[in-house]
From Swiss-Prot:
Belongs to the metallo-dependent hydrolases superfamily. Urease alpha subunit family. Its EC number is 3.5.1.5. This is Urease subunit alpha. NCBIfam families: PRK13207.1, urease_alph. One of its GO terms (cellular component) is cytoplasm. The gene is ureC.
Length: 569
């Protein structure tokens, strides 16, 4: 007969349920469970004396009869689509079903069948998110990949060939030969990848050649000459070949001002990198592009959030990244023109308003590859403390703000780059690129990461201990990060032209290749929870930023969550 148990006891046993609230790490962000897809009294849980046993929560159904490969039980899902509790069934490396797991022979309402061939991951008291997507990578060194993976990222997009000086400054893998070598190298790592080629050319032939060789995007960078002619040529090729274009505009305004760049772009879709400007772009008013429907604005993480240390560290970073010389006054003036506290402060607020749509790193080129997720949540926390609740919030929680910020490094970059049918959210049919977090470590240190349904990284104690938990516990690569499992779990994103030409066979790639699609009809209004288009004015003398006439300014943070408390060693 049914019985009731205290809510605290239930949460301790099966995780939080509808109406329960959870704090995210040491931030002031509180989420509330909106709904629970499991069935009270019929929850499945693995362990001695628990439910997932033969004839109880485990059925006799074979894999061929639709039992799942893996079940994640009682997970608290935090996604752009909502904050809710469910069991998640994985099969063939994809999310098979989100709902209620168990044995249909003994339990009601079961839509995820647990069989003898099903592995169990305990999601009770854990948060489940889609793997993060960092869409601004300088492939300067392969060690970045490990740092990124261990922070909760499962997909990286960018360009480069290693520590060549072109790569140190620009996210471009130039030419078919380099693209081929990089794709062959990236075959070896437990991470999904896409490469961007150089987009700076005034004639289309070389750009077509690079996209056909496997690049899934093109990058226009001022260090290669982002002139109106190059912008027009690059976008014309992109429209023809269905790949995205990322742009780093002309800081010095040598070949034109922001208005000239906007005229060259026209109404064509483009992904605007570090749209605040410290990372590069028309000084001082590149930020005005956030108001355009065809421009998809992103930030890189060194300016996020604005703190008392932000300005001081940026000048030296910029000199190194762009191969500048402190003994040349013009180089110093170039660097100083990009670092403006007024626009950096406004960037925080525009993210909170949903005007900036994407967060990325700019790895080792004025950005930290392992801090995309950390800095996203630090910004959300800073904005809650400084600006209060969002008008969109309902109830005593921060669900709307949390969904806005998680979209910035999951679904929105996937939409921008034509990958959203495969990655970016927890949806049935998408790849099982998933990250499990303890709420106390949310945003800082993932408990476990899966790519294509295979565990590639997890917190693990001393391997020589009698149990997995003795210290030192830290994130370590798991079986999915080794051998042939890497090849079958992660993928390489390429252009449709390269996919049709059989680029995988041409280069002898072991990973599957997937073509990006529908990159040219994405608009700002498609950016989930981040589609606000204010009219931006930047004062050319004071650098004050106004959105729809409202002055945007905030104080720099003097301390942040998700910081030294979590990194004592």
């Amino acid at each position: 007969m049914p019985t009731k148990i205290p809510r605290n006891d239930y949460a301790a046993m099966y995780g939080p349920t509808t109406g329960d609230r959870v704090r995210l790490a040491d931030t002031d962000l509180i989420i509330e469970v909106e709904r629970d897809l499991t069935t009270y009294g019929e929850e499945v849980k693995f362990g001695g004396g628990k439910v997932i046993r033969d004839g109880m929560g485990q059925s006799q159904v074979t894999r061929a009869q639709c039992a799942v490969d893996t079940v994640i039980t009682n997970a608290l899902i935090v996604d752009h689509s909502g904050i809710y509790k469910a069991d998640v069934g994985l099969k063939d490396g994809r999310i098979h079903k989100i709902g209620k797991a168990g044995n249909p022979d003994t339990q009601p309402n079961v839509d995820i069948i647990i069989g003898p061939g099903t592995e169990a991951i305990a999601g009770e008291g854990r948060i489940l998110t889609a793997g993060g997507f960092d869409a601004h990578i300088h492939f300067i060194c392969p060690q970045q990949i490990e740092d990124s993976l261990h922070s909760g990222i499962t997909t990286m997009l960018g360009g480069g060939t290693g520590p060549a000086h072109g790569t140190l400054a620009t996210t471009c893998t130039p030419g078919p030969w380099h693209i081929g070598r990089m794709l062959q190298s990236l075959d070896a790592f437990p991470m999904n990848f896409g490469l961007s080629c150089k987009g700076n050319a005034s004639q289309p032939e070389a750009l077509v050649e690079m996209v056909s060789a496997g690049a899934c995007a093109m990058k226009l960078h001022e260090d290669w000459g982002t002139t109106p002619g190059a912008i027009d040529c690059c976008l014309s090729v992109a429209d023809e070949m269905d790949v995205q274009v990322m742009i780093h505009t002309d800081t010095l305004n040598e070949s034109g001002f922001v208005e000239n760049t906007l005229a060259a772009i026209g109404d064509r879709t483009i992904h605007a990198f570090h749209t605040e400007g410290a990372g590069g772009g028309h000084a001082p008013d590149i930020m005005k592009v956030v108001g355009y429907e065809n421009i998809l604005p992103s930030s890189t993480n060194p300016t996020m959030p604005y703190t008392v240390n932000t300005l001081e560290e940026h000048l030296d970073m910029l000199m190194v990244c762009h191969h500048l010389d402190k003994s040349i006054p013009e180089d110093v003036a170039f660097a100083e023109s990009r670092i403006r506290k007024e626009t950096i402060a406004a960037e925080d607020i525009l993210h909170d308003m949903g005007a900036f749509s994407v967060m990325a790193s700019d790895s080792q080129a004025m950005g930290r590859v392992g801090e995309v997720i950390i800095r996203t949540w630090q910004t959300a926390d800073k904005m809650k403390k400084q600006r209060g609740r969002l008008a969109e919030e309902t109830g005593d929680n921060d669900n709307a703000r949390v969904m806005r910020y998680i979209a910035k490094y999951t679904i929105n970059p996937a939409l921008v780059h034509g990958m959203s049918r495969e990655i970016g959210s927890i949806e049935e049919g998408k790849r099982a690129d998933l990250v499990l977090w303890s709420p106390a470590f949310f945003g800082v240190k993932p408990e476990m990461s899966l790519i294509g349904g295979t565990i590639v990284m997890a917190q693990m104690g001393d391997p020589n201990a009698s149990i997995p938990t003795p210290q030192p516990v830290y994130s370590r690569p798991m079986f999915g990060a080794f051998g042939r499992a890497v090849e079958r779990s992660a993928v390489l994103f390429v252009s449709e032209a390269a996919q049709a030409a059989g680029i995988g066979d041409q280069l002898g790639l072991a990973k599957d290749t997937l073509a990006v699609k529908s990159t040219r009809d994405i608009r700002k209004s498609d950016m989930i929870h981040n589609s606000f288009r204010p009219d931006i004015h930047v004062d050319p003398e004071t650098y004050d930023v106004r959105a729809n006439g409202e002055l945007l300014t905030c104080e720099p943070a003097t301390d942040l969550p998700l910081a030294q408390r979590y990194f004592m060693y």
